[in-house]
C-alpha cells in the first residue's frame, strides 16, 4: 500500500545493533502455546502492550514469528481493515485512530495496523501514543533484522508475509530501482532484491508449516 512509502520517509533510521538469534519456528510454536512458558504468547502480548521497551530480542522473535501459529489475526482482506485503509487514504486521522484501536486490540502485532496508527498519532500530535507504538514497531522489525543478514539464501531475512516484506524493504531504504527475482521453496519463497552488485535475500514464510 502507498502509505508505507510515505510513512517510512521519517522512520527509516530504526534498526539498532543487536545479536543475531537463530530462528527455530517449531520451538516458537511450542513455547507460545505452553501455559507455563516464559514465552507464552498471551503473557508476551501483555508485556508488549504495557512496556514494549522491556521486551528482549528472544521475546520479540516469539511475538513476531509466533503470529504464524495464531488464528485471531487481522487480514488486509477483511472489511474492517479496508475501512481503516480508506480512512487513511482520505487523511481522516481521527477515524483512523478510532478504527485502528479496535483492530489493534484484536491483533496488536500487526505491522499494517501499527503503521496507520503511528501516522495518525503523528498527524494529531499525540506524542505519547506515537512513542509507544514506535517502540513496538522497532522491536518487531528488529526481530526480522535479527533473523539473518540478507546476504545469501541460507542467511536470508525472514518475514511472515509479502506485506511485511515491503515494510521491511522501506526501512532498509530499498527503493523501486531494485529488481526482484523469486524462488519457490517448500516452506516459503526466497526473493532476491538486486541493484548492481548489491543483493538482499528475503524469505517470505508460508503460514502452513509442514516440515
Question: Over which residues does each language-model region extend?
Answer:
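Alpha-solenoid helical repeat scaffolds
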Residues: 111-116, 132, 148-150
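TPR/TPR-like (Sel1-like) alpha-helical repeat modules
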Residues: 122-145, 173
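N-terminal alpha-helical interaction modules that lie
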Residues: 20-90, 144, 152-211
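TPR repeat positional signature
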Residues: 80, 114-117, 121
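Bacterial Sec-dependent N-terminal signal peptides
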Residues: 1-23
Amino acid at each position: 500500500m502507498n502509505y508505507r512509502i510515505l510513512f517510512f520517509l521519517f522512520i527509516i533510521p530504526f534498526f539498532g545493533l543487536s545479536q543475531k538469534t537463530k530462528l527455530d519456528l517449531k520451538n516458537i510454536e511450542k513455547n507460545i502455546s505452553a501455559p507455563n512458558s516464559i514465552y507464552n504468547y498471551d503473557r508476551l502480548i501483555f508485556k508488549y502492550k504495557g512496556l514494549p521497551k522491556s521486551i528482549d530480542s528472544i521475546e520479540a522473535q516469539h511475538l513476531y514469528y509466533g503470529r504464524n501459529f495464531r488464528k485471531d489475526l487481522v487480514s488486509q482482506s477483511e472489511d474492517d481493515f479496508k475501512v481503516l485503509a480508506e480512512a487513511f487514504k482520505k487523511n481522516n486521522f481521527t477515524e483512523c485512530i478510532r478504527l485502528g484501536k479496535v483492530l489493534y486490540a484484536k491483533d496488536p502485532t500487526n505491522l499494517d495496523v501499527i503503521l496507520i496508527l503511528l501516522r495518525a498519532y503523528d498527524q494529531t500530535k499525540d506524542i505519547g501514543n506515537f512513542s509507544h507504538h514506535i517502540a513496538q514497531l522497532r522491536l518487531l522489525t528488529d526481530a526480522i533484522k535479527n533473523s539473518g543478514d540478507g546476504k545469501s539464501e541460507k542467511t536470508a531475512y525472514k518475514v511472515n508475509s509479502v506485506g511485511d516484506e515491503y515494510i521491511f524493504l522501506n526501512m532498509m531504504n530499498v527503493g523501486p530501482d531494485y529488481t526482484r527475482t523469486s524462488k519457490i521453496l517448500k516452506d516459503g519463497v526466497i526473493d532476491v532484491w538486486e541493484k548492481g552488485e548489491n543483493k538482499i535475500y528475503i524469505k517470505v514464510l508460508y503460514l502452513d508449516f509442514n516440515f
